[in-house]
Amino acid sequence: MKNYKIEAFENLVDAFSSLPSVGKKTAIRLAYHAVMENGFAAMKLAHALETGVNVIQKCSKCHNMSEDELCTICSDPYRDSSKLCIVQSAKDILTIEESGQFKGVYYVISEVRDMDEDHLFYAVGGVREIIFAFPPSIATDTMILYIEDKLQGLKIHFTKIAQGVPTGVELENIDIMSLSRALEARVKI
């Protein structure tokens, strides 16, 4: 039986399939759209990807995404540098910034084993409150305890974001850990 596959198309499908949350069928649809229906948009995407990979780096202070040595948040003199929000990923910074509720600065720590203690001490200079914005898990609770222990000699107030019942979700669809934390952190009305 003869193979009628087009190698360049298969390579494009494989490239799309390597992205998070993109399965084979979606990759085929994206590849087809790119090469057969909107070549200009595909070239624009290719250029944006190449530019992003070549230009975006980690901020030297907080590890956020940046085009310069310091990200736009660390270099903003109007941010409240007394409040430091520690997150697991630069993607988390994007999410928090979209909420418009936090005006402090950030620090990204993905795992304890990746943490540079000297760099962390540099990042917390002048900080009066550290807010941990981690998803709830035993691993993140352990990381919080570890960081608190390392910084205990400093006069810093430690908090973490509230966790509990999301808006619009039925109680039967909530995991037990989230429901337990919501009950523990209940507020007076």
Segments from the language model and where they lie:
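Short Cys/His-rich Zn2+-coordinating modules
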Residues: A8-D14, E37-Q57
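Long C-terminal interaction/binding lobes of large macromolecular proteins
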Residues: F121-I189
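Conserved phosphate/pyrophosphate-binding and hydrolysis machinery centered on Walker-type P-loop NTPases
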Residues: K2, P20, G39, G52, ...
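Extended interfacial segments that mediate partner engagement and assembly in macromolecular machines
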Residues: A27, D76-S137
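Conserved, well-folded catalytic cores of nucleic-acid-processing
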Residues: L19, E37, G52, M65, ...
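Cys/His-rich short segments
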Residues: H47-I93
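Extended, structured, electrostatic nucleic-acid-contact surfaces
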Residues: M1-P20
